From Swiss-Prot:
The lineage of its organism: Bacteria, Pseudomonadati, Spirochaetota, Spirochaetia, Spirochaetales. Homodimer. It catalyses: tRNA(Thr) + L-threonine + ATP = L-threonyl-tRNA(Thr) + AMP + diphosphate + H(+). Keywords: Aminoacyl-tRNA synthetase, ATP-binding, Cytoplasm, Ligase, Metal-binding, Nucleotide-binding, Protein biosynthesis, RNA-binding, tRNA-binding, Zinc. The gene is thrS. Residues 185-478 are annotated as: Catalytic. This is Threonine--tRNA ligase. Belongs to the class-II aminoacyl-tRNA synthetase family. Binds 1 zinc ion per subunit. It comes from Borrelia garinii subsp. bavariensis (strain ATCC BAA-2496 / DSM 23469 / PBi) (Borreliella bavariensis). Its cofactor is Zn(2+). It is an enzyme of class 6 (ligase). One of its GO terms (molecular function) is threonine-tRNA ligase activity. InterPro entries: aa-tRNA-synt_IIb, aa-tRNA-synth_II, aa-tRNA-synth_II/BPL/LPL, Anticodon-bd, Anticodon-bd_dom_sf, Thr-tRNA-ligase_IIa, Thr/Ala-tRNA-synth_IIc_edit, ThrRS_anticodon. It is found in: Cytoplasm. PANTHER family: THREONINE--TRNA LIGASE, CHLOROPLASTIC_MITOCHONDRIAL 2, THREONINE-TRNA LIGASE.
Amino acid sequence: MSKDLYKEDILYKKRHSIAHVMAEAVCDLFPNTKIAIGPPIKDGFYYDFEFKNPITEDSLLDIENRMREILKTGSSFEKEIISLEQALEIFKDEPYKIDLIKNFDLQNEISIYKSHNFIDLCRGPHVDNMNKIDPKAFKLTGIAGAYWRGNEKNTMLTRIYGTLWNNEKELRSYLNLREEIKKRDHRKLGKELDLFSIHEEIGPGLIFFHPNGAKIRALIEDFWREEHSKNGYDILFTPHVGKSWLWQTSGHLNFYKDSMFEKIEMDKSDYYLKPMNCPFHIAIYNTGKHSYRDLPFRWAELGTVYRYEKIGALHGMMRARGFTQDDAHIICTHSQVVDEIKEVLRFAIYMWSKFGFNSLKAYLSTKPDKSVGNNSDWEMSLKVLKEALSDFEVPYEIDKGGGAFYGPKIDLKIVDSLEREWQMSTIQFDFNLPERFNMTYTSEDGKEKRPFMIHRALLGSIERFFGILVEHYGGAFPLWLSHVQAVIIPVNNIVEDYTIKVFNKFKNAGIRIKLDNSSSRMNAKIREYQAKKIPYMFIIGEREAIEERISIRTRTNEQINGIELDEALKLILLKVRDKEIS
């Protein structure tokens, strides 16, 4: 559901209203608390407070009980338009509200909402009265720190999160889903499965891939390169830093500097770690002259970029400061645009299917009020994007005015096994950089023209994609992506020669296999490797050795007894080749 549609939804109004109820309950229980903001969000709501004394999650139950008492009053939510002077008087003891009021656009009206004994600076919307909210359908879910206005230089506030649904059944369903999400948290599984780590003492937001995780990442990247080569892309490698003139020309220093690392002074010049790969690809293009006969260029790179994300925004692999972007840029003529866009969309759908994502949603962002490029190019580009989405029957919503100033775009979102949407692929026209860097090609009539430039990311950040895969599969990667695909577990030492034969046969065929001939008990080994999410355990006893067979136990506890060795190898190789998900 889009943001605009959500605002009209009854749940949005209920969640907005319950946030006010929570703020009143907090102020009742903790006098002298200062209130900040409390909006509805996806799946719930929050409110930020400055407490005189810190609170803990132990206080949440008391707050919930007080909220239910307030809800029982059935009080109305009443909107009132007030003047600037009235607002300053009403909230004179609330410094965060005063800060908001002083930054208001005075051309807009100032509105407040009154409910029970609480008044808040608010645009709404809300439910008519508290009877519309089921007192058994909400729960406070946690406490976190949040800087006022998201600025680390400001006061750290206490944010209380909650969730609210239409009824108790919906709430229970959501809370069960939250528990499953916690179990699958990539940070938790990353540690348990020895996939990656983050070392705050070395640098927050920087990912260290361990051997297990590095193997999986290498498999992802190898597949990425192979498929890009098949689809007519040339692979590029570019530096991690560039001089300031490059970022000045691209516009990053004017519009993106807050998200860039500080400059590095060296050789009497200023350098910056790259936040994006685009200017480097353009530099390669501009090393020579190009004819219309040379185009299109499809250039792709797994390029590491660095972005100065705020500490509070960092979240494991999902939000990092150093990550590898699967960038591509297509440089083409006007007549090639339609085919190139359709091919990018087809390629994106194909790539996602190979990783087990078959449910896609798209958001088409149109021209904002301020933009570069002429109207005809914008209109043509939007038409092409719409046509491509229709041809591939991808459902989409239009984000009116949501395009970047330099061109329209499609954002593709995948839906994971927990029914969460993740924005991954972007297909973005750029009318800005070709102009800034004076990109040209010689057209059929011998004149110099600007090429069209399309930015394209499929997987987005490799690190983020890795984290999504961990949670999507709960750590149980498909066979083709598992760092170890099978483990041989001999029943006793008598079958040692045969287990070595099996090990060598599978290893030489390219299967990632391990032989465990330790003294641990067989059942303990099976439990260990199931916990490690290894797809197959080959159980070999004397009968299997005599008949040259194996028995297979899967990580989901399925049993296949006495399968012929060559048949087992053939089946596994087929699953790997076809990149089967199950």
